[in-house]
Amino acid sequence: MEHTYQYAWIIPFVPLPVTMSIGLGLLLVPTATKNLRRMWAFPSVSLLSIVMVFSADLSIQQINGSSIYQYLCSWTINNDFSLEFGHLIDPLTSIMSILITTVGIMVLIYSDNYMSHDQGYLRFFAYMSFSNTSMLGLVTSSNLIQIHIFWELVGMCSYLLIGFWFTRPIAANACQKAFVTNRVGDFGLLLGILGFYWITGSLEFRDLFEIFNNLIHTNGVNSLFATLCAFLLFVGAVAKSAQFPLHVWLPDAMEGPTPISALIHAATMVAAGIFLVARLLPIFTVIPYIMNLISLLGIITVLLGATLALAQKDIKRSLAYSTMSQLGYTMLAPGIGSYRAALFHLITHAYSKALLFLGSGSIIHSMEPIVGYSPDKSQNMVLMGGLTKYVPITKTTFLLGTLSLCGIPPLACFWSKDEILNDSWLYSPIFAIIACSTAGLTAFYMFRMYLLTFEGHLHIRFQNYSGTKNSSFCSISIWGKEGPEPVKKKLLLSVMNNNQKVSFFSKKIYQIDGNVRNLMRSFSTHFDNKDTSMYPCESDNTMLFPLLVLVLFTLFVGSIGIPFDQVGSDFDILSKWLTPSINLLHQNSNYSVDWYEFVTNAIYSVSISYFGIFIASLLYGSVYSSFQNLDLINSFVKIGPKRLFLDRIINVIYNWSYNRGYIDVFYATFLTKGIRGLAELTNFFDRRVIDGITNGVGIASFFVGEGIKYVGGGRISSYLFVYLSYVSTFLLIYYFYFLNR
């Protein structure tokens, strides 16, 4: 066992040769490297599989009762200062390593087919391998210096991956937005590290925790300064894990390829912030203000992410806001003292969200030959629908991922989310009510996404999209329609004009531009043809295999944390796994409950989830297809004060969700413009005032010199006479005025 731990330092560097080989190959032999580009997927997957096996071995040893292992190598700079580098193997490290490698392998296998026709195929695999290296280095770090080094590398890789298609201006802006937003968090993290080194004199975790806890208990440190330093450390996690108010980069990060979105949202960048909070929780627990702040920002993010997902039409952006909300749950858990539930939900959400993102990539892949290769079309759920018969395997896997995220038993996220909800009742009833309500919203917007994508009919096939003639195609729009006639707001099932596109969960009708209309007309001319190439097709087996594997994880990974305490059985593997870390936090490690208590607690949360699914099915399902007479529907929808008031409320909710809660507008209006205004004011002051003074002195000196040079008439003797006269005058003034006072 000791032998295995000693060589754990190699874990982060195993995937690195792929990045180096691709870089050197493109530099030295670019033609041969590009001709053999498809071969690079094999070493990428193989090397990461080696890390997975190594991590699995370490995890088994941790579960069987091994203690925390730490290896340090000291680099002495002088007698007063030395840097220690090494690796730390504990339950948190082993959990994160397993998570990173398993999700990473599935994403790499998926990407081999998804990116096969992209010119940046080699660059993609180089970035992905380096991202895995950076994240593995982060989770095995034994001190804050290593954490910061790999933290910056993770941010750099995310910048490169989000801006992978950097020739697209929107992608270039998205990666810059992510980079700048995370600079705020990284700056706070660096200041926090320096502050804690000043307090404790150590950056190594064990010494840091022990010294800081002793100082807090003996009042050996200023509590305000300690709280400030802890807050700065937490700011780094807030930015990385897209917590309010530094969450604005996450939806725009969807401009990268879909496999990148799956990796970032499941196992790398957004997981890094949660990992940092879990790693530094022994510091945060002794500062109540920080724990309260963690739980507060967590619950705000939970609710905000769910509300912003309600009106999204882009399938990837909907999943992005879902990630934001679920990370809020994961951040809420450590804030309320539920360390185990936080890591449990991090695990279950990672596999479910990876499944959903890769499933969305399969959907996008099937839609691109029909609607074109623009993300505005291929990712638009308004143009989807009825995909069940075209992509049945993708549909089944996506449904299971959706049900898992909704919290439906026995899928993975049910077990972890239910534990967080139960613990939130013990912490604060207000927080618990918000968390439970958001569980219902999660079920609503996730099933909305599923129904718009797979149920009904393929929306783009209807002739009203082609512009050829009117149709009786009806769309559900609970937001109402914008127009001068009152009757337009009367219909829940509204007939769309031939130049208008269906706006699900939207209050507005958008005109279809000429290019889209021509594309749709081209499709409609082939509609009566038997050529099946114009229909969505199921993805290749290389893309379906990772989906099926992730389905297995989604089905069974929740079993590692089942908290049942039965005689002769021990289901709770996760608690055994986390025992050393829980003991370090001095918490009660007894998480077991009996069957009756568990079922009683679960009924409430599952009922809320089913209610959200029911509402989504009512509004977006096929229930309206049975009503052939619109008057039957309209008879239930009469214009009146209550109806108008309800419309106003719905429109307010829609505007809030569609406009991202106006947070981006606020930043653009006050922060960005304010900084630019300050920069312009500073530039004006520098050019007009500072430069004006210096240039004015120079110009004045020039003209004075030009004026007095004629006094001497051009003769040296005259210049000397004038010079000596002035010197004598100043000396006399100095003598009589200053010395005789």
Swiss-Prot record:
- Keywords of the record: Chloroplast, Membrane, NAD, NADP, Plastid, Plastoquinone, Quinone, Thylakoid, Translocase, Transmembrane, Transmembrane helix, Transport
Q: Where in the cell is it found?
A: Plastid, Chloroplast thylakoid membrane
Report the leader peptide range: none
Which cellular component terms (GO) are annotated to the entry? chloroplast thylakoid membrane
Question: Which InterPro entries does the record associate with it?
Answer: NADH_UbQ_OxRdtase_chlpt_su5_C, NADHpl_OxRdtase_5_subgr, ND/Mrp_TM, NU5C-like, Proton_antipo_N
An example of a Pfam family matching this protein is Proton_antipo_N
**UniProt superkingdom:** Eukaryota
As its record notes, the protein acts as a catalyst of: a plastoquinone + NADH + (n+1) H(+)(in) = a plastoquinol + NAD(+) + n H(+)(out); a plastoquinone + NADPH + (n+1) H(+)(in) = a plastoquinol + NADP(+) + n H(+)(out)
The record describes its membrane topology as: Multi-pass membrane protein
Segments crossing the lipid bilayer: 9-29, 40-60, 89-109, 122-139, 147-167, 185-205, 219-239, 258-278, 280-300, 396-416, 425-445, 544-564, 603-623, 719-739
Biological process (GO) annotations? ATP synthesis coupled electron transport; electron transport coupled proton transport
Q: Which GO terms describe its molecular function?
A: NADH dehydrogenase (ubiquinone) activity; quinone binding
Q: What is its EC number?
A: 7.1.1.-
Q: How does it assemble?
A: NDH is composed of at least 16 different subunits, 5 of which are encoded in the nucleus.
Q: Please name the NCBIfam families in this protein's record.
A: NDH_I_L, PRK06590.1
Q: What does this protein do?
A: NDH shuttles electrons from NAD(P)H:plastoquinone, via FMN and iron-sulfur (Fe-S) centers, to quinones in the photosynthetic chain and possibly in a chloroplast respiratory chain. The immediate electron acceptor for the enzyme in this species is believed to be plastoquinone. Couples the redox reaction to proton translocation, and thus conserves the redox energy in a proton gradient.
Regarding protein family, the annotation reads:
Belongs to the complex I subunit 5 family.
Protein's name according to its UniProt entry: NAD(P)H-quinone oxidoreductase subunit 5, chloroplastic
Q: Lineage of this protein's species?
A: Eukaryota, Viridiplantae, Streptophyta, Embryophyta, Tracheophyta
